[in-house]
């Protein structure tokens, strides 16, 4: 398994406020739409972007965008909030969220450096239309003190089942915390998906390049630790892992009904089994399939019974 099988997704978030406008906590009128129009105009030069206004958005579309991480819960509660999303969903810009402009950039695997180049180019284009609040000493001014400075958070989502199963994750988290890097589970404790987000905590006093470097070092450390833990796991628990991964893959291919939580947990065990060669399937293709079978995505597709439809599609695609 390559590093990109452990590193699932990279994300860069840039938080900005606009000169001459109140911060979102006080911007509760149609002036937020003026900002949205300016940002959309800057992005629309390249085409392929769609503007969504929260007040005019259907519940199904709102849930789908939220499920895919393209908008936040906070934005959905903003009556003057908007989102501008690229057709391939690799770029999402939220307007009137915690800050006036919150840019999100997504990429597969560990690709922070390339993603930052893309983010910088688009941020510069937006900056030509909207003058950002910038202090010569402090940097970008944001609503939350944790974002002041670069206004940038760089994160990578990692699949770390062996570190979790061997109880080694906490010690790894402690070691990278010295770099002001946090590790947080993507899901709550009730879901055993073994997905964790690695993110910088410091935005002030560091350049964007230094942040990318620090997060990259933490990610590399965790990938090496996961690879070592997988070798140890095979030595200590091969029969248990083989059995659980084969059962998981068998259920994915044969169940009549399946919840989204069960699907995620089974996929993660099947993916670990694929790493060891216990089962054989295209994990990347399956990951795309699973994204299309989350609750809001299925509701948008108009399926009568969500769990029956999910299991039917898994049987169809995996057999």
Q: Residues of each region from the PLM?
A:
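Active-site His/Glu-centered metal-binding helix of metallohydrolases
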Residues: 148
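Long, Pro/Ser/Thr-rich low-complexity/intrinsically disordered regulatory tracts in eukaryotic proteins
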Residues: 1-137, 144, 152, 164-166, ...
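Short glycine-/aliphatic-rich beta-strand segments at the starts of folded cytosolic domains
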Residues: 154-160
């Amino acid at each position: 398994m390559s590093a990109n099988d452990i590193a699932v997704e990279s994300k860069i978030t840039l938080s900005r406020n606009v000169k001459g406008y109140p911060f979102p906590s006080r911007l509760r009128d149609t002036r937020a739409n003026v900002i949205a129009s300016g940002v959309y105009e800057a992005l629309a030069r390249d085409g392929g972007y769609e503007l969504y206004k929260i007040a005019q958005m259907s519940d199904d579309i709102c849930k789908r965008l939220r499920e895919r991480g393209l908008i936040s819960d906070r934005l959905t509660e903003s009556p003057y909030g908007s989102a501008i999303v690229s057709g391939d969903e690799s770029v999402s810009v939220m307007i009137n969220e915690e800050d006036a402009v919150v840019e999100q950039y997504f990429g597969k695997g560990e690709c922070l450096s390339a993603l930052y180049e893309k983010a910088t180019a688009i941020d510069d284009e937006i900056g030509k239309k909207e003058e950002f609040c910038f202090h010569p000493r402090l940097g970008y001014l944001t609503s939350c003190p944790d974002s002041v400075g670069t206004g940038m958070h760089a994160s990578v989502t990692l699949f770390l089942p062996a570190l979790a199963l061997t109880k080694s994750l906490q010690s790894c988290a402690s070691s990278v915390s010295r770099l002001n890097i946090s590790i947080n589970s993507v899901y709550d404790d009730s879901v055993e998906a073994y997905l964790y987000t690695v993110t910088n905590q410091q935005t002030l006093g560091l350049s964007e390049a230094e942040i990318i470097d620090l997060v990259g070092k933490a990610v590399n450390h965790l990938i090496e630790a996961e690879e070592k833990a997988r070798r140890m796991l095979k030595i200590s628990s091969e029969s248990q892992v083989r059995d659980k991964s084969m059962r998981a893959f068998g259920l994915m291919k044969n169940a009549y009904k399946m919840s989204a939580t069960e699907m995620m947990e089974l996929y993660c065990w099947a993916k670990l089994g694929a790493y060891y060669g216990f089962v054989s399937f295209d994990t990347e293709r399956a990951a795309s399939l699973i994204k299309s079978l989350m609750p809001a995505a299925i509701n948008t597709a108009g399926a009568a019974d969500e769990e029956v439809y999910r299991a039917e599609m898994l049987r169809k695609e995996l057999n």
